Amino acid sequence: MYRWVFICNVVTNNYTTMNIFYLHRDPYKAAEYQYNKHVVKMILESAQMLCTAHHEIMGDDADVPYKRAHVNHPSTIWARQNKNHYRWLFNHMVALGHEYTARYGKTHLSINKCFLPLYRYPVGMPDGAFEQPPQCMPDEYKDDCSIKAYWNYYIGEKHIVAGKNEKIYEKIDMEAL
């Protein structure tokens, strides 16, 4: 357990590492809430985590567009733990792709490259119950509920990612999530 927390804390000190912005339990709504910078960035990161799941589970038999990436990152580990995690992240990647197209009028390259290869689970991936994604953020934002923690993080660190013309989240009605 200590190693998991240590890894999570280390990677969150660098805002360019992988993450899953779990802003709503519905992967499509979670994508809608994301700032433009994350919509652009998180499609590739989600695709990398899903491709890594294929590589880690299927080994040399994996036929996916991207190489392994951040194999030991808590979010990448979470994505490959079971089919429910994988499916949530896949649906979230697709939803981010829809958001990208709606906001920028074009299709993200990772959607073109990865949709079909990642549509199917890696052969041998176990079933399992859905658990909230890990909270990879500074400790000050963490909460028992990952959705609340990610909103704490999103509101607290908005100056890092919000564009000049974007709606800035100051608070959120947690009951609506």
Each language-model region and where it sits:
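Sequence termini and other peripheral, non-core segments
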Residues: 4-72, 76-177
